[in-house]
Amino acid sequence: MEQPPEDQGPQREPYNEWTLELLEELKHEAVRHFPREWLHGLGQHIYNTYGDTWEGVEAIIRILQQLLFIHFRIGCHHSRIGIIRQRRIRNGSGRS
């Protein structure tokens, strides 16, 4: 039978450390784009729903990722990423 190699490459960070670092990065970025009061309310909702659990940490990460993605996709004023809305100028050139 085939056996997996003994050396699986470099040791990875433990999942919980990586998850907490990701959460801190997302929180730091979210504070730059959303009101603190709104983010605090979101955090309270997650805490009331999940308590102090890893499931709550994963939920807030998922929500912050989705919010930031949509925010950038719509067009953040702090970023070049996103849809650039162009105004149409009516000059009559497109009419026949």
Swiss-Prot record:
Disulfide bonds: none annotated. It comes from the Viruses. The keyword Ion transport applies. Its main location: virion. The modification Phosphoserine is found at S79, S96. It is found in: Virion; Host nucleus; Host extracellular space. Residues 1-42 are annotated as: Homooligomerization. One of its GO terms (biological process) is symbiont entry into host cell. One of its GO terms (cellular component) is host cell. The keyword Phosphoprotein applies. Pfam families: VPR. Gene3D superfamilies: 6.10.210.10, VpR/VpX protein, C-terminal domain. Phosphorylated on several residues by host. These phosphorylations regulate VPR activity for the nuclear import of the HIV-1 pre-integration complex. HAMAP family: HIV_VPR. HIV-1 lineages are divided in three main groups, M (for Major), O (for Outlier), and N (for New, or Non-M, Non-O). The vast majority of strains found worldwide belong to the group M. Group O seems to be endemic to and largely confined to Cameroon and neighboring countries in West Central Africa, where these viruses represent a small minority of HIV-1 strains. The group N is represented by a limited number of isolates from Cameroonian persons. The group M is further subdivided in 9 clades or subtypes (A to D, F to H, J and K). Belongs to the HIV-1 VPR protein family. During virus replication, may deplete host UNG protein, and incude G2-M cell cycle arrest. Acts by targeting specific host proteins for degradation by the 26S proteasome, through association with the cellular CUL4A-DDB1 E3 ligase complex by direct interaction with host VPRPB/DCAF-1. Cell cycle arrest reportedly occurs within hours of infection and is not blocked by antiviral agents, suggesting that it is initiated by the VPR carried into the virion. Additionally, VPR induces apoptosis in a cell cycle dependent manner suggesting that these two effects are mechanistically linked. Homooligomer, may form homodimer. Interacts with p6-gag region of the Pr55 Gag precursor protein through a (Leu-X-X)4 motif near the C-terminus of the P6gag protein. Interacts with host UNG. May interact with host RAD23A/HHR23A. Interacts with host VPRBP/DCAF1, leading to hijack the CUL4A-RBX1-DDB1-DCAF1/VPRBP complex, mediating ubiquitination of host proteins such as TERT and ZGPAT and arrest of the cell cycle in G2 phase. This is Protein Vpr.
